[in-house]
């Protein structure tokens, strides 16, 4: 992903303030509520019968935290996202058979969650930078599919 120094500073600076546990659970929960067909990958998580059940499901929260932790780790490798996400790409492609479009959807949900929590601090410039990053991460995660 090519970011200007200003964009990189916005992304890294804002991510340092992210509550990975809370926001990660919220993002994965929102993905499952907004795009219900994604639930088929998480049927073993128990009750996904309603928005409330999903948003309060401890397994959804825990996996969301894991997703955000991986995303944060990826931010340390913006110049080589494909390398940073190679193992996860392989796992999601070969073992889990996740539709790579879901990575793009989750990236957009991640941006929504950041906007919700950071309000005015999540400026149009910050959003533009994050959109570049989530597109790059989605592309890296889909790499094994090509």
Swiss-Prot record:
MF term (GO), any: oxygen binding
One Pfam family assigned to this protein is Globin
| Keyword list, A-Z | Acetylation, Heme, Iron, Metal-binding, Oxygen transport, S-nitrosylation, Transport
User: Can you supply a Gene Ontology BP term from the record?
Assistant: hydrogen peroxide catabolic process
Gene3D superfamilies for this protein: Globins
Q: Does the keyword Transmembrane helix apply?
A: no
Q: Does the keyword Iron apply?
A: yes
What family does the Swiss-Prot or TrEMBL record give for this protein? Belongs to the globin family.
- What exactly does this protein do? Involved in oxygen transport from the lung to the various peripheral tissues.
Q: Give the UniProt tissue specificity note.
A: Red blood cells.
Please list the residues that bind heme b.
Answer: 63, 92
Modified positions (N-acetylvaline) are 1
State the protein's name. Answer: Hemoglobin subunit beta
Residue numbers of S-nitrosocysteine PTMs: 93
Query: According to its record, what are the GO cellular component terms?
Result: blood microparticle; haptoglobin-hemoglobin complex; hemoglobin complex
Where does the Globin domain lie? 2-146
Q: Which residues carry this modification: N6-acetyllysine?
A: 59, 82, 144
Q: How does it assemble?
A: Heterotetramer of two alpha chains and two beta chains.
